[in-house]
Curated annotation (Swiss-Prot):
Protein's organism: Desulfitobacterium hafniense (strain Y51)
InterPro entries hit by this protein: ATP_synth_B-like_membr_sf, ATP_synth_b/b'su_bac/chlpt, ATP_synth_F0_bsu_bac, ATP_synthase_B_chain
Pfam families reported in the protein's UniProt record: ATP-synt_B
Record protein name field: ATP synthase subunit b
Any one cellular-component term (Gene Ontology): proton-transporting ATP synthase complex
Principal subcellular localisation of the protein: membrane
Localisation: Cell membrane
Family: Belongs to the ATPase B chain family.
Amino acid sequence: MNPIHFDLTLVVQVLSFLLLVYILRRFAWNPLINMMEERRSQIEANIANAEKERLQAEQIKREYQEEMRKARQEAQEVIAKATKLSEQRAAEILAAAHGEAEKIKQSALADIERERDRAIAQVQAQVADLSVAVAEKIIRKNLDVRGQEDMIEQFIQEVGELPC
């Protein structure tokens, strides 16, 4: 073999390769580029859809949080209103109870006053009866001073035994 020898197989291989590149470029390159372009468009569309869905999800989340905030606020308002109402009702009940207690107290004081007056009237009547009885006895007996003192002493003891 001669080092300068020209090998035909090499030329055929180079020509075959160039022919293959030409055929691929002519028939496969455009479909391959189109397929890659479609894939890129599809990926971009998927990314855009994902971003759109993410934005929608964030909007839904904000709406949900706003609804929850409103619900909490309404619940707090209902609780505050119920608390205020119960405090008012408790104050009304307490005022009514104080009023009723005052009525009962006044009634009891009036009853006590009437009973005291009645007892005083009874004692006065009994004292009057006893005074008349003593005077009657004194007049009947026409006693001496010593007898009168004994009679007065007995009268004082009888008055002391009376219920008040």
